[in-house]
C-alpha cells in the first residue's frame, strides 16, 4: 500500500535515495534494483522489483507477481493492512508464490505489530512463531533495524526453493518497461529469468524481432 515504506526500505538496502525523486512521494513505475550481499561467507545477488502501492497501479503489481520468484509484502506497523495490501495478498496467494512479510516502521510510537499480525491471520498468513509457515520480519527501514535479517531470509528462502538459472541456455525473461529514446532508439528494461543475454543477440517479443545493440546494468 502507498506510504508503507517499500521504496524507503529499498533505499536502505541499496543505499540510494530514490524516494526523494518520486513525484508526490509515491512510486509510479516498476523499478529494478540489483544488489549483492554476503551470506554464509558467499556473495549472493538479489534483484528487487519495487512496485507502486497506489490503487491506480494494480496492473503493475499483478505483472510483478506474475514474473517474480518470491514476494515481500511490506506493511506499515502504524497502518496495518490497507486495500492494496489485501489486493497484493490475493495476487500472491492466487499465484502460489513464496512470501515474506516485512512489518515496517516499528520505530514509530503508534506502531501496533500485534494488530498487523492479527489482520494478516485473517488472510491465512500465520507467522512461523505462531505455528504457521510465513516468515514475518519486524523492521525499520528508517533506522536499519533487522534489515540484515530480511536479506538473510530472502536468500535462505530462495535456496530452499532451489531458484537457479542455467547460464548455458538461451535467455528467457520479461520486459518491465520500454520506450523510444531520441538518440538511442528503442530501449527496454528486461528481467532475465534464465540463460544469458549478450550484445548481438536477437530477442523475440510476440511477432517482433530486435537485435541487442547495448546492455546496461
Regions found by a protein language model. Give the residues of each.
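Ordered, soluble secondary-structure elements with a strong preference for glycine-centered loop motifs
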Residues: 3, 20, 82-83, 103-112, ...
Amino acid at each position: 500500500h502507498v506510504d508503507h515504506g517499500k521504496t524507503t526500505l529499498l533505499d536502505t538496502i541499496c543505499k540510494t535515495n530514490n524516494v526523494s525523486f518520486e513525484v508526490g512521494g509515491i512510486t509510479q513505475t516498476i523499478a529494478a534494483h540489483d544488489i549483492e550481499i554476503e551470506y554464509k561467507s558467499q556473495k549472493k545477488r538479489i534483484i528487487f522489483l519495487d512496485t507502486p502501492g497506489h490503487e491506480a497501479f494494480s496492473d503493475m503489481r499483478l505483472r510483478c507477481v506474475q514474473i517474480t520468484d518470491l514476494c515481500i509484502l511490506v506493511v506499515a506497523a502504524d497502518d496495518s493492512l490497507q486495500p492494496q495490501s489485501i489486493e497484493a495478498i490475493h495476487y500472491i496467494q492466487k499465484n502460489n508464490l513464496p512470501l515474506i512479510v516485512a512489518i515496517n516502521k516499528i520505530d514509530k510510537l503508534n506502531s501496533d505489530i500485534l494488530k498487523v499480525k492479527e489482520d494478516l491471520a485473517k488472510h491465512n498468513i500465520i507467522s512461523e512463531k505462531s505455528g504457521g509457515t510465513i516468515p514475518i520480519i519486524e523492521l525499520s527501514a528508517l533506522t536499519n533495524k533487522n534489515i540484515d535479517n530480511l536479506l538473510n531470509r530472502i536468500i535462505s528462502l530462495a535456496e530452499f526453493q532451489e531458484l537457479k538459472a542455467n547460464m548455458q541456455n538461451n535467455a528467457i525473461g520479461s520486459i518491465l518497461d520500454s520506450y523510444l529514446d531520441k538518440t538511442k532508439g528503442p530501449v527496454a528494461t528486461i528481467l532475465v529469468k534464465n540463460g544469458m543475454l549478450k550484445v548481438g543477440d536477437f530477442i523475440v517479443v510476440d511477432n517482433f524481432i530486435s537485435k541487442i545493440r547495448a546492455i546496461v546494468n
